[in-house]
Design a protein with these regions (language model features):
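N-terminal beta1-alpha1 cap of cysteine-dependent amidohydrolase-like domains
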Residues: 1-133
Length: 134
């Protein structure tokens, strides 16, 4: 039985050898550094345990990607994965589709937008399964 440390006892699990599970790469959330907290002196990349638990319960093997601008790394992520999951997060910057109206930049994450736009392009190129949430 595979689960995360935060899995509750009522979370369904699939008894499958991890080597036989489809590899689902998960795009992380981006959290800026908080210089006043010693444990977050640099930015963090993370995924929610509930997202990991859901992939495990569905029979997948979740693995977190790292955010990068390197298209070759992104392409390799997609090539080795059986599927890609992108969890919800901040708003996508409206400027990406030509909306020039004022918008609160604290509601967006340009680092994540840039990575995820490249990632989705590569997923579509490779015709791999893609699961996203809002």
């Amino acid at each position: 039985m595979i689960g995360t440390r935060t899995s509750s006892s009522d979370t369904p699990h699939v008894d499958v050898d991890p080597a036989d599970r489809p590899l689902i790469l998960v795009a992380p959330r981006w959290e800026e550094a908080k210089p006043f907290l010693s444990e977050t002196l640099s930015p963090n990349e993370e995924i929610a345990s509930v997202f990991v638990d859901a992939i495990l319960a569905a029979g997948g093997l979740p693995l977190q990607m790292s955010i990068t601008e390197d298209i070759e790394v992104i392409r390799h992520y997609v090539d080795i994965a059986d599927g890609i999951a992108i969890p919800g997060g901040p708003d996508v910057n409206p400027k990406r589709w030509g909306d020039d109206r004022p918008y609160d930049p604290t509601l967006c994450c340009e680092i994540r937008d840039s990575f995820e736009f490249k990632l989705v392009g590569e997923v579509l190129r490779a015709k791999k399964p893609l699961f996203t949430t809002c």
